[in-house]
Amino acid sequence: MKKVIKKIALAYSGGLDTSIMIPWLKEHYEHAEVIAVICDLGQQEDLDTIKNKALKSGASKAYVVDVKNEFAIQYLWPLVKSGALYEDQYILGTISRPLIAQKLVEIALTEQVNAVAHGATGKGNDQVRFEYSIKALAPQLEIIAPWRTWDIKSRQEAIVYAKAHGIEVPVTPKAPYSRDHNIWYISHEGGVLEDPSQEMPDDVLLMTAPVSQTPDEEEVVVLDFKKGVPVALNGQELSPVDLLNSLNQKAGQHGIGVADIVENRLVGMKIRGIYEAPAAAVLYKAHKLLESLCLTRSTLHLKQSLQQTYANLVYEGRWFSQTKQALDAFIDVTQQHVTGCVKLKLFKGNIIPAGMHSPYSLHHPELATFEEDNVYNQKDAEGFINLFSLSAKIYSQVHQEGNYD
């Protein structure tokens, strides 16, 4: 017997993909009540307007949940500590998806709904991220993914459907960019961007100045970290949200943090995306520099070898997994002494190191100097080299003599 859906909680953004969800759900699930869940991730949109749009579209209720601080502390700071970049380029702004799913589930359980819905397409990664998280947190909930079942097959058709139902969306056929925005990044996809052979148009960037329009003077920023987490900017302790907003503004005006990449989606296809993440680029650079000062060689190398694994977990939406918890435990140990101050210069799209120090620095000038010293006995190196190269020496001797097993 088919389960009757009476109440649906919808992850709602007010954009094209979710703007047409409410009328469609009400049409296809007879008498179903739709509750919109809107997460404030710092997307700098008028959320009251979005809430009213949801209600005007037929939602019985619309929740606006401010998750900016939680997003920074519980998601972005662990990401900074990990140093993870998907395919060595992507700054992983979609790390917000598990948090959105978590809030969707919390409200769904409070409202006692029997289904949740999202606006992710059947060709993208977000459907996996949302549904993995929902199944991990509340496996009893039914999941509705309209993009996989309805007759709408393109963004142009979605625009037509929206207009037919009197829904205003910030997209036109002439500039059909699909954008995602939070305090960590802005992504741009679709339209002319789908062709990697085409240069990025001037109208794409929203947070970052083109390099040709950046100041002709460098700007110095100083970042303080405590156990791998940024705590102050230019000597001033700031909340995570204020730090990110301030750094986005400073780095953005210098053209920093733009990535034009072709990535491998989880579902098997390649997609081109433009990503703006000024603050993220600066924080990653500063954190990496501080780690080079504070971590031992073997710890740093092991951590670097696990960064792609961590990036894959985030990219695939496996935030609520045992593997991710285990990696977090390792990373937290590595960050115990990643405390200190990093000075950087921002200029014409470049992040230039300008000095750093830490009370836990493992750099000893008396050991590293090229001048005469009384600490390092260079004669000790000969014995080390003999032992270090012993296996290579034996291998060469055996094969030169033709003594094969």
Swiss-Prot record:
Its EC number is 6.3.4.5. One of its GO terms (cellular component) is cytoplasm. L-aspartate binds at residues 121, 125-126. CDD domains: ASS. One of its GO terms (molecular function) is argininosuccinate synthase activity. One of its GO terms (biological process) is L-arginine biosynthetic process. L-citrulline binds at residues 90, 125, 129, 178, 187, 263, 275. InterPro entries: Arginosuc_syn_C (IPR048268), Arginosuc_syn_N (IPR048267), Arginosuc_synth (IPR001518), Arginosuc_synth_CS (IPR018223), Arginosuc_synth_type_1_subfam (IPR023434), AS_cat/multimer_dom_body (IPR024074), Rossmann-like_a/b/a_fold (IPR014729). It is an enzyme of class 6 (ligase). Its main location: cytoplasm. Coiled coil: none annotated. It catalyses: L-citrulline + L-aspartate + ATP = 2-(N(omega)-L-arginino)succinate + AMP + diphosphate + H(+). SUPFAM superfamilies: Adenine nucleotide alpha hydrolases-like, Argininosuccinate synthetase, C-terminal domain. It is found in: Cytoplasm. It comes from the Bacteria. Keywords: Amino-acid biosynthesis, Arginine biosynthesis, ATP-binding, Cytoplasm, Ligase, Nucleotide-binding. Pathway: Amino-acid biosynthesis; L-arginine biosynthesis; L-arginine from L-ornithine and carbamoyl phosphate: step 2/3. ATP binds at residues 11-19, 119. Disulfide bonds: none annotated. Homotetramer. NCBIfam families: argG, PRK00509.1. Belongs to the argininosuccinate synthase family. Type 1 subfamily. This is Argininosuccinate synthase.
